[in-house]
Amino acid sequence: MLQIQVEEKEEDTEESSSEEEEDKLPRRESLRPKRKRTRDVINEDDPEPEPEDEETRKAREKERRRRLRRGAEEEEEIDEEELERLKALLDENRQMIATVKCKPWKMEKKIEVLKEAKKFVSENEGALGKGKGKKWFAFKMMMAKKWAKFLRDFENFKAACVPWENKIKAIESQFGSSVASYFLFLRWMYGVNMVLFVLTFSLIMLPEYLWGLPYGSLPRKTVPRAEEASAANFGVLYDFNGLAQYSVLFYGYYDNKRTIGWLNFRLPLSYFLVGIMCIGYSFLVVLKAMTKNIGDDGGGDDNTFNFSWKVFCSWDYLIGNPETADNKFNSITMNFKEAIIEERAAQVEENIHLIRFLRFLANFFVFLTLGASGYLIFWAVKRSQEFAQQDPDTLGWWEKNEMNMVMSLLGMFCPTLFDLFAELEDYHPLIALKWLLGRIFALLLGNLYVFILALMDEINNKIEEEKLVKANITLWEANMIKAYNESLSGLSGNTTGAPFFVHPADVPRGPCWETMVGQEFVRLTVSDVLTTYVTILIGDFLRACFVRFCNYCWCWDLEYGYPSYTEFDISGNVLALIFNQGMIWMGSFFAPSLPGINILRLHTSMYFQCWAVMCCNVPEARVFKASRSNNFYLGMLLLILFLSTMPVLYMIVSLPPSFDCGPFSGKNRMFEVIGETLEHDFPSWMAKILRQLSNPGLVIAVILVMVLTIYYLNATAKGQKAANLDLKKKMKQQALENKMRNKKMAAARAAAAAGGQ
């Protein structure tokens, strides 16, 4: 009897099946113990086995595979020592994956080490789940990897969804951060207006369109008979009269019923609350952006080793696009120019007496310009009031649009004058920009408030006119009833007269001062947009074409002399954007469509102005870096928001709404819709509690507490900022002391070595 112990050598038939089973098991080959199996004892004298039938052979093959599978499972049992060693190796490789880009190695070595670490983790991470009690750990590791990948992909998705990011990066690389800050501000304003539009469209315009009474059902929703012939003309629609006036675009179209539609939607309440909500949201988002910028600004001075940081840390090694690399190169170059200009400006010696005289002269000219523009606005307002009393058919296009055109032209030419005056002052470019913005802001704010005062006079005239219209409507109704009764008296006894009916287009109506206010703001917005675009086409595009194609045959160099290419007017564009947004906040309560019109304006402005900057403008001769916190723009926006909402709140609280148009018709004041809702839709005890909470004494106390809290938080923030500055100074001083101590120790060691020799 010969016994043969055979070391396992997989045969062809067994090799394929065993490898298929092993591939399904994620394990590390090097950590799996070697295994040997002793086959059955083979006796050479035994007779050859009889041939098996098909069923017996299949049963034996199935049993063999079951034994192989069970053996593979037993083989996966790893002892505790090997398991701990594998965990340590996996943690080490994961740490290497996370920190390999920070290693001071060549790129080839980084890539090679990263590939090896990822391969090791992917091959051996599943081995931790083999054995009793380890599968839950493997599942957690797998889910952690999938969650990290999901977060990374989601961040990439959010970055890809940021609108106009590549356009703004290209502009920043060519023109610097100061010009790019305007487009970033424009994009932020686009997002704010998108939220305002969603609120007004979904809660005001859409419910009225779906559930309100259709056009022609009420006098407020019908074009008067005298205007029907010209209601659809382009000139009338461009002036937002005719069909545009009697639509959901303006305040007067909305019905004053408490509920509309099968959902019993409370439209007057929604209209009032959405108007207040838009104002509150605007304040909240501006203040939040300002606080975020303050947080991003850091705690103090951060200019230590400024040029060293720019030299060694500016390049992004993950860039793989040649165009992106060119933009990044230009951006780094522009950043160096900005930093060098900042450094030189801090070392320039100035003639203080000459500079003071020139600055006084510049401010004198600025005050003259502001006074002249104010007088011109006042004169235009007086003329517009005179034109309002005349027949509109006798007026020309300029006479109808004189007020809007004067304001647009002043906003276009006065910033250029202020820019010329700023050349006399010789401020640092960033400080000069702030002075220029402040002057243009004062100009536009004065123009806006003169416009509001003119509107207030017109509103008072409309309110007086309403009283006469009410009396006339009463007489008209009495005459109509009298005529109807007379027509019935002429009929025989058994004859029924026709029902009394008057078409809504024939009913007399009031002037509806709210719609008039909304129309004025919409017209001013549209005229401002058209003026801006025409200015870009004529002042930038045609000028650039003339300089580009006529420079070869001209007497002097047009590119470096007069007229040359234009520079991008940061101050004028920023103030125009802020001024326009102030008009949106002021007029959106009386024209719910105004945020949507402004979205179209901002959307087209982004593409149009980006094209104009890249094709028609040149970088500024005086390069400067924009502030890291954009709070100067936001501060002016917050001020214009406050000044814009004051007239609106005054109109809501003090002026009576029109009697025959708008959702608040029939009430003495617009805010009475809140009391009406409390009376009809809330329990009496809740209405009583809300009235007590609205007590002026309690409101004043809450406001005082809020003011004191804000003061305390502001003082705390200033103290923390001062503490951060002190800590930075101490750290710098400690670094200098350590440096001097190391130098002394090195000198002492050198002296000792020299003495020993």
UniProtKB/Swiss-Prot annotation:
Detected in cochlear inner and outer hair cells and in neurosensory epithelia of the vestibular end organs. Also expressed in cortex, cerebellum, eye, colon, ovary and testis. It comes from Mus musculus. It is a multi-pass membrane protein. Pore-forming subunit of the mechanotransducer (MET) non-selective cation channel complex located at the tips of stereocilia of cochlear hair cells and that mediates sensory transduction in the auditory system. The MET complex is composed of two dimeric pore-forming ion-conducting transmembrane TMC (TMC1 or TMC2) subunits, several auxiliary proteins including LHFPL5, TMIE, CIB2/3 and TOMT, the tip-link PCDH15, and possibly the PIEZO subunits. Changing residue 569 to N: Reduced Ca(2+) permeability. Reduced channel expression without affecting conductance. It is linked to Defects in Tmc1 are the cause of the dominant deaf mutant Beethoven (BTH). Heterozygotes show progressive hair-cell degeneration from day 20 onwards, leading to severe depletion of inner hair cells and scattered loss of outer hair cells, and progressive loss of the Preyer reflex from around day 30. Homozygotes show almost complete degeneration of inner hair cells, and little or no Preyer reflex at any age. Changing residue 317 to A: Disrupts interaction with CIB2 and CIB3. It is found in: Cell membrane. Residues 1-74 are annotated as: Disordered. GO terms for molecular function: calcium channel activity; mechanosensitive monoatomic ion channel activity; voltage-gated calcium channel activity. This is Transmembrane channel-like protein 1.
